[in-house]
C-alpha cells in the first residue's frame, strides 16, 4: 500500500515499516484514541497528581512523557502536532504552572495531524486515587461522567440562555468541556452483536 501524506508518497522499505503503515490505515472499526500527557517546563504538585490520575484512567491508551518540555500550546502548536503524528495520538494534555496562570491543564484535540481545538482549565485540587480506600479502576474501563446544570444542556428547546440564566460564552465553554471529556474517555468501541 502507498500512503499519501499531503504531497509526498512514502513506500515501505521493509516488512516492519509495512506493518506500521498498515496499522495507521483507515479501518472499518477504529481503535480507541491515544492520549499524550506532557509536562511543561514548570508544573506544580497539583498538576502532576492530576495528570498522573488522568493518565491512569486513560490506560492502556495513554503515553506519558517523562521529561519536561518547553511547550506553549496557544503560541506554537507545531511540537504538539509532531508528537501527535509520531505517537499516532489525537489527544494531548499539557500541564503547566506559571505565575499568571498557576496549575493549568491544556486539553488538545488533533484531527488529521492538525490542532482541532484546545481548552485550558485550572486545577483547584487534586487527590490521588491511592488516598481512597476503594478498589482501583481496571485497565481499559471507562469512567462515568455526570454533567448537571443548564450550562451542559445543548437542546435547542432549552437553549434559551435568558431562561437558563447562563452566560452564552461560559455555556459554550461548558459544552466544549463536555464534548472534550466524552471524546477523551470514550475508549474502545464495543461490537453491538456480541
What are these regions (language model features)?
Residues 3-194:
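Phospho-regulatory, Ser/Thr- and acidic-rich intrinsically disordered linkers and terminal tails
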Amino acid at each position: 500500500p502507498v500512503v499519501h501524506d499531503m504531497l509526498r508518497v512514502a513506500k515501505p522499505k521493509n516488512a516492519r515499516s509495512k506493518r506500521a503503515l498498515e496499522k495507521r490505515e483507515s479501518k472499518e472499526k477504529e481503535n480507541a484514541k491515544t492520549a499524550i500527557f506532557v509536562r511543561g517546563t514548570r508544573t506544580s504538585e497539583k498538576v502532576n497528581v492530576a495528570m498522573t490520575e488522568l493518565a491512569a484512567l486513560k490506560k492502556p491508551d495513554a503515553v506519558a512523557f517523562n521529561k519536561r518540555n518547553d511547550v506553549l500550546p496557544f503560541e506554537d502548536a507545531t511540537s504538539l502536532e509532531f508528537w501527535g503524528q509520531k505517537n499516532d495520538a489525537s489527544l494531548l494534555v499539557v500541564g503547566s504552572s506559571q505565575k499568571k496562570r498557576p496549575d493549568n491543564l491544556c486539553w488538545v484535540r488533533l484531527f488529521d495531524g492538525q490542532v482541532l481545538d484546545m481548552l485550558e482549565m485550572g486545577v483547584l485540587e487534586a487527590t490521588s486515587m491511592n488516598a481512597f480506600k476503594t478498589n482501583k479502576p481496571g485497565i481499559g474501563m471507562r469512567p462515568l461522567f455526570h454533567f448537571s446544570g443548564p450550562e451542559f444542556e445543548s437542546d435547542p428547546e432549552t437553549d434559551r440562555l435568558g431562561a437558563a440564566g447562563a452566560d452564552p460564552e461560559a455555556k459554550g465553554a461548558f459544552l466544549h468541556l463536555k464534548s472534550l471529556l466524552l471524546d477523551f474517555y470514550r475508549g474502545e468501541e464495543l461490537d453491538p452483536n456480541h
